[in-house]
């Protein structure tokens, strides 16, 4: 069976009010019980872990749009039955007409919309690594969009926090506010008929169903009429790519992560530094302080991920050892200064 980690972790429990669920052929964990149940259903229907991941991801796009909508980006890491590790990069890309010197510096709105990668990434995963047809894998997502689902407290709360932004645009007002113009409350039944139609088209046509044809035209028309620069060519030319896999080792365990835009290299660097600490000897306060210091010093290396020489450096054990000693020396220096000052 394939193993996968996609923006969320696939898995599950016997109780439907949990975010994980368990079946006879595997475990699925996601941010929503309906997504986890969808993954288990696929496993028990003969699908593999990739099929389950894709099913769960599409359900999340329905029931948790604030965190997992199809308008975002995706990265996935996959372990094949032969042990080979592969990655998928479906990152959001900037439109062809984007100019950093003249483009508005907004934090949200139509001018900030790039080329979404989630659909291309999920279809690539399904096509290259899945076993079941895409229309079968997407059945539950379409069902919940068409017939409705009860919104959970977390999603309701996040949409409430974004109400000011939601009210600024006709599309978001239509789909994320009720008939009275209020946010949906926890337990409300939310039906997304238009989104169900979109998902059906994707399930029948794959990538082209979203990045070409009627859906693409509707997206581009809406974006351009409201100040965005996305074009039909931007969508049509988008491709999810194979992602570079980075590998390390932590206390005897192999660690596999992904290259940019994931911070996989920083994750390995953090683990390499942590491997020099005797964590069992630390009390709770020391443990928290140590982790904070390690994360802080590793995050300073984020720009180094872009270049091959510096990438190799931050992945190296020797570099991690130097950083470990610099943290120890800094801690000793602070302790000495405190003692001299009578603290």
Where are these regions (language model features)?
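Active-site catalytic pocket residues across diverse enzymes, especially alpha/beta-hydrolases
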Residues: 274
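Internal maturation/activation junctions in enzymes
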Residues: 280-343
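Flexible, polar/acidic helix-loop-strand segments at domain edges
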Residues: 265
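Noncatalytic scaffold domains of N-terminal-nucleophile
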Residues: 15-37, 41, 47-206, 210-212, ...
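Phosphate/diphosphate-binding loops
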Residues: 277
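Bacterial N-terminal signal peptides
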Residues: 1-9
């Amino acid at each position: 069976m394939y193993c996968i980690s996609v923006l969320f972790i696939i898995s599950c429990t016997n109780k439907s009010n949990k975010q994980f669920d368990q079946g006879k052929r595997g475990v699925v964990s996601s941010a929503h019980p309906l997504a986890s149940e969808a993954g288990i259903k696929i496993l028990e229907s003969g699908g593999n872990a990739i099929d389950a991941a894709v099913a769960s991801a599409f359900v999340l796009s329905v029931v948790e749009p604030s965190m997992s909508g199809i308008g975002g980006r995706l990265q996935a890491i996959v372990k094949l039955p032969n042990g080979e590790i592969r990655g998928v990069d479906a990152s959001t890309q900037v439109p062809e007409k984007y100019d950093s010197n003249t483009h508005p510096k907004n934090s949200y709105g139509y001018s900030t919309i790039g080329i979404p990668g989630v659909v291309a990434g999920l279809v690539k995963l399904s096509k290259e690594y899945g076993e079941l047809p895409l229309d079968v894998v997407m059945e539950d997502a379409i069902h919940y969009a068409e017939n409705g689902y009860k919104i959970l407290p977390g999603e309701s709360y996040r949409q409430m926090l974004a109400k000011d932004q939601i009210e600024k645009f006709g599309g978001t007002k239509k789909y994320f506010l009720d008939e009275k113009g209020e946010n949906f409350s926890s337990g409300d039944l939310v039906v997304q008929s238009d989104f169900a139609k979109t998902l059906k088209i994707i399930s029948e046509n794959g990538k082209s169903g979203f990045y070409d044809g009627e859906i693409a035209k509707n997206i581009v028309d809406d974006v351009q009429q409201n100040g965005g620069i996305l074009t039909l060519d931007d969508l049509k030319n988008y491709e999810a790519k194979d992602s570079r896999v980075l590998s390390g080792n932590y206390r005897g365990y192999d660690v596999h992560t992904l290259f940019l835009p994931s911070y996989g290299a920083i994750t390995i660097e953090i683990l390499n530094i942590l491997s020099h600490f005797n964590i069992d000897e630390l009390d709770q306060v020391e443990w928290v302080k140590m982790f904070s210091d390690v994360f802080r010093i590793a995050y300073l290396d984020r720009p180094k991920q872009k270049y091959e020489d510096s990438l190799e450096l931050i992945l190296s054990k020797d570099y991690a050892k130097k950083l470990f000693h610099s943290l120890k020396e800094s801690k000793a220096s602070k302790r000495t200064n405190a003692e001299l000052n009578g603290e």
